[in-house]
């Protein structure tokens, strides 16, 4: 007689399958490594392993002057360079200007140029985020179309600073150089032309059946979960929460610009894609307004220690030449003080805690990167989805490991 119970005892219990996902190449969302636990094709657990791109940025900054530390911020989220320079420059300015008895304000022209290039950077980032996300899922054409436009934006970087990526253009006290001739007209032409290109990319993806199947209902995050995990940017606004630092805590006269905060209802991957696409339209509107607000004037504070002497005088006046050399070699002293500065980076809230101690170097610089907090939520977002959906979720988080690992 067949003993059924004995047969069942001999059957081994199936164990979950553990998969090493990555590390990926730095060009593919950074050096990301995941330990993925699977039950068949379904994700049970995702454990991110970080630190493969750790360079000790916060510690390195402690050994540099306030001016020498600026280029490190280009190399954090290397897709959103100018926005991070903007945050650091604001932090240094607030530390320094708070120590003075007189009230000083950054020149109006410098503020407008900062806003202009911060929004150009936002468009740069969202082009990268949306089109590489599409490429990860299998749609190659949007990537090829949009990167042709992205190249034009990189040329604007090059024309104002000489560098395509690591510009070090926004500096404490203002900006490094004034706008070159005819660049305003070229940026305006780009805005008009890119709106049409953006509509073409939308037509290709928004109602695409396969694209929607891969994104809709994937990685749903409730408003409560988004707040608990510390999500900001599109991952928070996708849950219907109206939070944008440019509106909630305006800096450099952002409150004088007319733009909308784009929010969603169902916070899934498709909603976040729509938000990023619509945010590009809002950035184009801000760029237009900034171009209209440009007036002749100074591009940096004058007569204060946090800005370098004008190069025009360096070749004519020995005192200016000496001061210029000492500014970059020895730096400037900031009295003991501390502050925390936040800006609305394309990926979310980018924050800098800066502590001064009566020397020319920061005592402590703590960097809060949005991607670090978003990556914590990847396990929550991936549960009960298929392995193929993990790729979609990495794309929807818009992770860059320069800022995560620091």
Swiss-Prot record:
It is an enzyme of class 7 (translocase). The keyword Translocase applies. It is found in: Mitochondrion inner membrane. SUPFAM superfamilies: HydB/Nqo4-like. Pfam families: Complex1_49kDa. PROSITE patterns: COMPLEX1_49K. Its EC number is 7.1.1.2. It is a peripheral membrane protein. GO terms for cellular component: mitochondrial inner membrane. Keywords: Electron transport, Membrane, Mitochondrion, Mitochondrion inner membrane, NAD, Oxidoreductase, Respiratory chain, Translocase, Transport, Ubiquinone. One of its GO terms (biological process) is mitochondrial electron transport, NADH to ubiquinone. Gene3D superfamilies: Cytochrome-c3 Hydrogenase, chain B. It comes from the Eukaryota. GO terms for molecular function: NAD binding; NADH dehydrogenase (ubiquinone) activity; quinone binding. It catalyses: a ubiquinone + NADH + 5 H(+)(in) = a ubiquinol + NAD(+) + 4 H(+)(out). Belongs to the complex I 49 kDa subunit family. Core subunit of the mitochondrial membrane respiratory chain NADH dehydrogenase (Complex I) that is believed to belong to the minimal assembly required for catalysis. Complex I functions in the transfer of electrons from NADH to the respiratory chain. The immediate electron acceptor for the enzyme is believed to be ubiquinone. Complex I is composed of 45 different subunits. Component of the iron-sulfur (IP) fragment of the enzyme. HAMAP family: NDH1_NuoD. This is NADH-ubiquinone oxidoreductase 49 kDa subunit. The gene is nad7.
């Amino acid at each position: 007689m067949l003993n059924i119970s004995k047969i069942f005892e001999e059957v081994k219990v199936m164990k979950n399958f553990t998969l090493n996902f990555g590390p990926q190449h730095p060009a593919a969302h950074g050096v990301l490594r995941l330990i993925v636990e699977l039950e068949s094709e379904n994700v049970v657990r995702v454990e991110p392993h970080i630190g493969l791109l750790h360079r000790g940025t916060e510690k390195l900054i402690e050994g540099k002057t306030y001016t020498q530390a600026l280029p490190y911020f280009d190399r954090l989220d290397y897709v959103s360079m100018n926005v991070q320079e903007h945050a650091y420059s604001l932090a240094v300015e607030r530390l320094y200007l708070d120590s003075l008895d007189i009230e000083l304000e950054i020149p109006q022209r410098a503020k407008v140029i900062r806003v202009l290039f911060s929004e150009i950077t936002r468009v740069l980032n969202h082009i990268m985020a949306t089109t590489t996300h599409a490429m990860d899922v299998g749609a190659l054409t949007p990537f090829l179309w949009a990167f042709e436009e992205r190249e034009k934006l990189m040329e604007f970087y090059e024309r104002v600073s000489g560098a395509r990526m690591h510009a070090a253009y926004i500096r404490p006290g203002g900006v490094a150089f004034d706008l070159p001739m005819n660049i305003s007209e070229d940026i305006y032409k780009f805005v008009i032309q890119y709106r049409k290109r953006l509509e073409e990319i939308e037509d290709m993806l928004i109602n695409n059946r396969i694209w929607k199947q891969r994104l809709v209902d994937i990685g749903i995050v409730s408003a409560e979960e988004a707040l608990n995990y510390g999500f900001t940017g599109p991952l928070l606004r996708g849950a219907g929460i109206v939070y944008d630092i440019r509106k909630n805590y305006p800096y450099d006269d952002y409150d004088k610009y007319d733009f909308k905060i784009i929010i969603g209802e169902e916070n899934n991957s498709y909603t976040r894609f729509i938000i990023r696409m619509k945010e590009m339209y809002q950035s184009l509107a801000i760029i237009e307004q900034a171009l209209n607000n440009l007036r002749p004037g100074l591009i940096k504070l004058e007569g204060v220690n946090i800005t370098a002497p004008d190069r025009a005088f360096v070749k004519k006046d020995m005192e200016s030449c000496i001061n210029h050399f000492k500014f970059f070699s020895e730096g400037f002293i900031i009295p003991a003080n501390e502050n925390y500065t936040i800006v609305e980076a394309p990926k979310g809230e980018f924050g800098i805690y800066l502590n001064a101690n009566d020397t020319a170097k920061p005592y402590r610089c703590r960097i809060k990167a949005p991607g670090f907090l978003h990556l914590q939520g990847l396990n929550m977002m991936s549960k009960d989805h298929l392995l193929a959906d993990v790729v979609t979720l990495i794309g929807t988080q818009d992770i860059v490991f320069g800022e995560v690992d620091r």
